Amino acid sequence: MSRPIRVALVAGEASGDILGSGLMQAIKARHPDAEFIGVGGARMEAEGLKSYFPMERLAVMGLVEVLGRLFELLGRRRQLARDLIAAKPDVFIGIDAPDFNLGLELKLRRAGIKTVHYVSPSVWAWRQKRVLKIREACDLMLTLFPFEAQFYDAHQVPVRFVGHPLADAIPQQADRAAAREALDLPQDGPVVALMPGSRGGEVARLGDLFLDAAIRLRALRPGVRFLLPCATPERRAQLEQMLASRDLPLTLLDGRSHEALAACDAVLIASGTATLEALLYKRPMVVAYRVAPLTYRILKRLVKSPYISLPNLLAERLLVPELIQEAATAEALAQAVAPLIDGGQVQTEGFDVIHRALRRDASVSAADAVLKLAGRD
């Protein structure tokens, strides 16, 4: 009788903890006695992960913070590699966190352990030479999006497109009436969601712009109301300060971004992962982004993709307007959003096709691929 399958996983942040816990559930459905070791958060630990150290020790953002913790991170990776090689798992899964996980995967693969990387870095957009390291470090790449799988196929990296868990979780048809009731909004009349980002720097660059665009939009559509979900108390305080000098029928929400998307008719949104959520809720959108001029010049040279927003990358065409840098003025944003409030059918039809393509029971698909690689399917 064979021993229980032993699976090692490392997640470095909350989104990875969610993906990891779903994957563990799907593996346990096939192998109830599976053993899980590695690094994860509360969700993965609840599924039975024995975590070598708190996941928060890996959750660093920004160059300065990474440099300040570099010796600790490298030391933890060396020790983790030793511990995992000694534990001899059937397979290792690095969940996102590529700067930490790819180096770990390389060491483990050289020691004879099968390695999987779950969630592709943005190699298709920039720093494409990273694919050489990925090819050396990974036995298998699991991607959330089909265009990523096409990129890896072209570079001879074994890959499986598993779909996106959000596409499984968000219904094909969101209930606008129920969402408006939950948010104490009237059932009639246009509602626009403003989503200028979740980080302080994004809100500093886009918050005033989005609020000025809302004022212009109000002149074009006098009855329109606005919702603005705040990711954290800090973002709420930042936005309250911006709102103090403006007279707008706007409701600030603590979190509740999914309810805001379900309740609204259209969205003005910063480029980022929230655009995928807006797409899955089938809400017509205008995407805007501004970065520091020097950053933009550098990115313009490095980025190989023709689009910046996920909806357009997934559609492989200009499905949603993208207003970037100087083009993102309050007037231009208002003019772009206004016709979408009751006329965004071309966008929503495209979103529906994409949602169906991404809905593949991602955790089960990922578990199938992992177990097949480990020879325990």
From Swiss-Prot:
The keyword rRNA-binding does not apply. Keywords: Glycosyltransferase, Lipid A biosynthesis, Lipid biosynthesis, Lipid metabolism, Transferase. It is an enzyme of class 2 (transferase). Its EC number is 2.4.1.182. InterPro entries: Glyco_trans_19. PANTHER family: LIPID-A-DISACCHARIDE SYNTHASE (PTHR30372), LIPID-A-DISACCHARIDE SYNTHASE, MITOCHONDRIAL-RELATED (PTHR30372:SF4). It comes from Ectopseudomonas mendocina (strain ymp). Belongs to the LpxB family. GO terms for molecular function: lipid-A-disaccharide synthase activity; phospholipid binding. Condensation of UDP-2,3-diacylglucosamine and 2,3-diacylglucosamine-1-phosphate to form lipid A disaccharide, a precursor of lipid A, a phosphorylated glycolipid that anchors the lipopolysaccharide to the outer membrane of the cell. It catalyses: a lipid X + a UDP-2-N,3-O-bis[(3R)-3-hydroxyacyl]-alpha-D-glucosamine = a lipid A disaccharide + UDP + H(+). This is Lipid-A-disaccharide synthase. Pathway: Bacterial outer membrane biogenesis; LPS lipid A biosynthesis. It comes from the Bacteria. GO terms for cellular component: membrane. GO terms for biological process: lipid A biosynthetic process.
